[in-house]
Amino acid sequence: MNHLIFLQSIMNLRGVGRKKSYAIVNQLQLDKSVNVSENEFIEQFSSIKEFKLYKIEINELRQCIDAAKRIFDEHAKNNISSVAFFENDFPKKLLEIKDPPVLLFYKGNISKLNNANGIAVVGARKPSLNSYDVSNSYAQIIAENNLGIISGLAKGCDTAAHKGALEKKGFTVAVMPCSLDDESIYPKENIDLFHAILEEDN
């Protein structure tokens, strides 16, 4: 059981969110080198205060491990990669926010998030034609100045910004609130844009 399954198992536990996950990771001194059996994981987790505090049963812990394995099995089928907050590839700026994620799931070249500067674009999902054109034009200018465009692949201004960056062969990042398999991508009308971003090795 590697560090990613270990972390996801913790995140699956009842009453354990991101902040508690960070505390548990620190207590267990978890890092990328961890490779333990299910029984070793249960033994380690049983030794910390959260286990007693939330009155978590052993069978519940096993269910969380099984659920984590299913997640990563599905990710493997869909070429979805993962990175933990303590790994070098994890976006450093993301660690500066108040409540950073413990795990990040991604497709494409995540190293660009650490090696290049970017500008976030947020706008209306139903913009006027002028607003759409402005978002697209600004994104092109930003891309021409070697800055990335970070947006959410939503309809409207997000779409315009991603397309503007791609038109100038710039890099763009789509931050998604859903899984990254084709069936889950939303909105469906942006599935081609999603793949265009990946094809540019972004």
Predicted regions and their residues:
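Short, positively charged patches
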Residues: 1-136, 140
